[in-house]
A protein has these predicted regions:
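Pyridoxal 5′-phosphate
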Residues: 1-326
Length: 326
């Protein structure tokens, strides 16, 4: 099995669940306290809570925030849907757009009267990098970031998407300081989500070498049939995003899966929504074009012959699909 979709869906191996992580209001919860200390050591935040990683869960977080909220349209599907739901209830959201090159338009933050900004250090699907440090020069808002694929120490609050980290839709984990959010009572904390999330983060490993190799091989093989929505130099070093002319990504995704090669079009693909990349559409492309997008991410090491094999199979399947579509 060759997983090139690990940033969209990763499966935690050798899951171990102990009764030690069952929380009680009447006895010490030493194992759980140890977990919270490990999070603090890794990320520097003093407080932790769990929440439903869904539009309803994010809506609950919005309602806890005492202030004006802005959201980058490059965030997770659940967060975007929560923003729309929040607006339907009569509240206001300031939306920060993407440029045609896939970068967050940080200049839209200038002169905005906002207190909280949902902005991650990368855009979903394309994994185009965003400088939280630069964003802080343009706004005094507290910045709340998804740190599942990349952690930026400049974020004021971070959260983790457990479905993408462990392959199970347990609660999300939120880390923060001060009194931005309320803490949960013992009986409402999803301690298993906290444990499994930490296990995944401690075992998270990225391959920084494969991007350049795959990029070269794909260009060489596909030639004029490959194109790029975003500059590869602007994306996370362990990710690669491109488009293939004349086919829908889902056709290639399904075909390659039969060869145990797993790739993605984006969140709409990995979450089972059967939707093309919303991010590409937010960049100004139409829905049809967004169906061409393909995302790779790199964790495991691969030998040169394995890379060649993947590229050869991808090229063969691409030509077959394209011939059938013509």
């Amino acid at each position: 099995m060759i997983k090139l979709n690990s940033l969209q869906y990763s499966k935690l191996q050798n899951i171990e669940i102990l009764n030690d992580f069952s929380l009680s209001a009447l006895t010490p919860n030493d194992s759980f306290e140890t977990l919270t200390l490990e999070y603090k050591k890794m990320f520097g935040f003093n407080k932790l809570k769990t929440f439903s990683f869904s539009k309803e869960g994010f809506l609950g977080l919005f309602l806890e925030l005492k202030g004006k909220i802005a959201i980058s349209v490059g965030e997770s599907e659940a967060l975007i849907e929560a923003g729309k739901l929040y607006e339907s209830l009569g509240f206001h959201i300031t939306w920060i757009n993407l440029n045609k090159d896939g970068k967050v338009n940080l200049f839209e933050l200038e002169n905005q009267n906002i207190d909280f900004l949902f902005l991650s250090s990368y855009v979903m699907d394309t994994f185009v990098k965003t400088s939280i440090e630069e964003a802080k020069k343009l706004t005094s808002a507290k910045i709340i970031s998804n740190a599942s694929a990349n952690f930026d120490k400049n974020s004021d609050v971070v959260f983790f998407d457990n479905y993408k980290l462990i392959g199970f839709n347990t609660s999300g984990v939120l880390l923060f300081n001060d009194e931005i959010f309320s803490l949960l009572e013992v009986g409402k904390i999803d301690s298993l989500a906290v444990k499994l999330c930490l296990d995944a983060l401690k075992n998270q490993n990225f391959n920084y070498k494969l991007k350049a190799i795959f990029l070269e091989k794909l260009k060489e093989k596909l030639q004029e049939n490959i194109y790029f929505f975003v500059n590869s130099n602007d994306t996370l070093e362990y990710s690669l995003h491109f488009g293939l002319k004349g086919i829908k990504a889902r056709e290639l995704i399904r075909t390659l899966a039969l060869n145990n090669i797993f790739i993605s079009n984006g969140e709409g693909c990995s979450l089972g929504l059967s939707k093309p990349s919303r991010i590409i559409q937010n960049m100004g492309y139409d829905e049809q074009t967004s169906r061409n997008a393909i995302s790779f991410s790199f964790i495991d090491d691969m030998k040169n012959e394995d890379i060649e094999k993947v590229v050869d199979i991808l090229y063969l399947k691409y030509k077959q699909i394209k011939a059938l579509n013509d």
